[in-house]
Amino acid sequence: MFLAATTGLVLAAGSALAADEDDRTAYVRTDLVSNLQNLVQPKDPDLQNAWGVANAPGGPLWVSDNNDGLSTLYDGNGVKQGLTVTIPLPAGQSTPPTATPTGMVWNPTGGFPITVGTATAPAIFIFDTEDGTIAAWNPTVDPIVKGRSTATRVVDNSNKGAVYKGLAFGTNKHGNFLFATNFAAGIVEVYDNKFAAKTLDGNFSDPDIPAGFAPFGIANIDNNLYVTYAKQNAQKNDVIPGAGLGFVKVFTTDGVLIKRFASRGRLNAPWGVARATQNFGQFSSSILIGNFGEQGDFAGWINAFSGGNDNDFLGSLRDANGKPIAIDGLWSIVFGTFLNSDADTLYFTAGPNQQQNGLFGKIVAQPRTETEAMK
């Protein structure tokens, strides 16, 4: 499917990156759910190119299924919950094809109203799509019938060629906002709590970003927005993967550049961003950056950075044999705050096999034995 800045860390791709060779932690990956029968049991055919995720605290984890226009729900054990939500296509379009949801947020406020007929209610979950739309859901206006519901389209920029790849929620002195990465236009779009487009004090710009790179993923960490950049293809609707093809910048929720966080090196079309908990092995409390890039060196790796003022590269998540964990088509990385999840476990979604399939899994930290450390 298709600026008072501090100098960030530029990662070399060679032997200088051996900071993680002496790993103290083995990271163990477990796949929980997939649409592939031979990968995980039980199989879920709806989980196709599992992309963005969101949840209310303690509620199920909602997953955007990019290949079939759905959002499906799971607990921390991978057990599917009894609701499936369809994401609508742009106005005037009909299936097939289906919509292509990407980013998603949970709305903790009473804003972002959805109106259907005479009924109005605040959005609970909000999605953006590669179709150039934003959709929102609340069962008051989007009724559930036999375990299924359909979200309501609230923004439609499909006729402008918008291609949204990520979505974040944030607050600043002006109020509550949505931040959508428009990969085709190379910008971060901003919407207020009535889904109206807005311009903030900053414009999410950094003159150091080379031409041909565009905002890809976006995550709110400690009320700062981490924006990842990937290289555009000729059509500007998808990424060109490859070692060193990526940047990460940090902005305020006003769109003002704070710092250049990471550049090139082990980045390969980075999308997912998460802050590790204090109990995640040697990379506790670090900022984790996940590579979506499906080809080239570092494809599907998860890299750790100090997250302080120095943005030091700390290493990559590795298994008990010291091999980097590589997840084909890696998208979201989040720690457990949802139903039956563990707070110190890293959960992930992915679209393996060129985004044709879907995967939801988890990674836990375990101390490495002395024998393992010598391998």
Which residues are covered by each model-predicted region?
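Bacterial N-terminal signal peptides
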Residues: F2-A12
